[in-house]
Design a protein with these regions (language model features):
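Conserved Walker B
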Residues: 49
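Phosphate-binding/switch region of NTP-binding enzymes
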Residues: 63-165, 170
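Hydrophobic "anchor" residues on beta-strands that sit immediately upstream
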Residues: 42-43, 113
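Conserved ATPase-coupling elements of RecA-like P-loop NTPase cores
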Residues: 53-60
Length: 170
């Protein structure tokens, strides 16, 4: 099964660019070339936003992250391709008793919250509390959904595989 899965992945149209300190201009250029070459491009993932630079002068890092956020939104519209942009959280979450992330915890910019159509957080109590009675459980919280409802879904977290599964299936 492992060989079959590896073979399937090897043949999948997945393109990885692990360029360090990439600028927004470089991402835009590479994404446009990829879209021209593969018109059915289905998704772009940025891991993670704070590792990027805007390539444009900004007064501070908050403004720079705001420029990156807006530029990714424009790129998604221009290419008609969804973009998932991962983001760090601020340290504020560590200072609260309830460690579940909230929108204001998005690091270095309120514009991330503003620009995003959907914001999803993952929370695992056992990450913060070793003796938690929530071992093997995760919460996926849709904190913002511009065109739909927000809610929290509980999933099973299979640490051994770094995999999430329906509670009923686990």
């Amino acid at each position: 099964r492992l060989t079959a899965a590896c073979d399937k992945l090897a043949k999948a149209p997945i393109y990885v660019d692990d360029t360090g300190s990439i600028t927004m201009m470089e991402i835009r250029s590479k994404a446009r070339r990829l879209k021209q070459k593969h018109p059915d491009l289905g998704l772009i993932i940025v891991d993670y936003l704070q590792l990027m630079t805007s390539g444009v002068s900004a007064e501070n890092r908050v403004q720079e992250v705001s420029q990156i956020s807006r530029s990714l939104k424009v790129l998604a519209r221009d290419l008609d391709v969804p973009i998932i942009a991962l983001s760090q959280l601020s340290r504020a979450v560590e200072q609260r008793h309830d460690k579940r992330p909230i929108l204001s915890d998005l690091r270095e910019s309120g514009s991330l919250e503003q620009d995003a159509d959907i914001v999803v957080f993952i929370y695992r109590d056992e990450y913060y509390e070793a003796e938690s009675d929530q071992q093997g459980l995760a919460e996926v919280h849709v904190a913002k959904h511009r065109n739909g409802p927000t809610d929290t879904v509980k999933l099973s977290f299979l640490r051994r595989y770094a995999k999430f599964a329906d509670l009923a299936a686990a």
